[in-house]
Amino acid sequence: DMYFFAKGIVIPHHYHGVTQVIATYLNREHGVELVDFYKFLFEYSKYSNGFLNQEYKNHTQSLRNSLFKDQTWGRTIDGGDDFHFQDNGATAAELYTNIDIVYEEIISIVKKRYNIDVQEVARFNKHILDLYQPKPQSLTFSKNYYSWFFHNKHLTNMDNTIIIKHNIYKDKIDHARHLFWFGRKSKRCFLTATEKEFA
């Protein structure tokens, strides 16, 4: 369980950014400790019957296969060749690919557990995440999420547009290798973006 908590929750959700903005919002604006949120997410992933539970099963079964059935360590990425990613990277890739389903679950469980609406925060989290699938270059938000998240500014009501710069990849495997395999570049998971306040 502690292995999955680190490799299946903390690394994909925080380090690879899937719920980093959401967790930071809950912490800074509502006093929910990061470790408490991720422990809750772990319990939900383990015992629910949604997509996050399916990924929990895939991740832990892959680990068992590696340890006890002498199979190659890690997993391949859907649509790829025989290149195996560590399970935390493979889980992150699955979460990225199914990001809308992931956020549906996250929004729902956060509302039930904390009575906090994180729909717009999740929308911002997705917007700045370096996803392989195409998405709009600019989105409008009601708060200054970009400067709040990246520059520790006070979160205020402020209609603004966040314009992202898409990264180009040869294919899904090239994307996965850049984000989930090569090195440990800080905030590699987030796109370069600018915040434009409405006049």
PLM feature spans:
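Radical SAM enzyme core and accessory elements
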Residues: 1-199
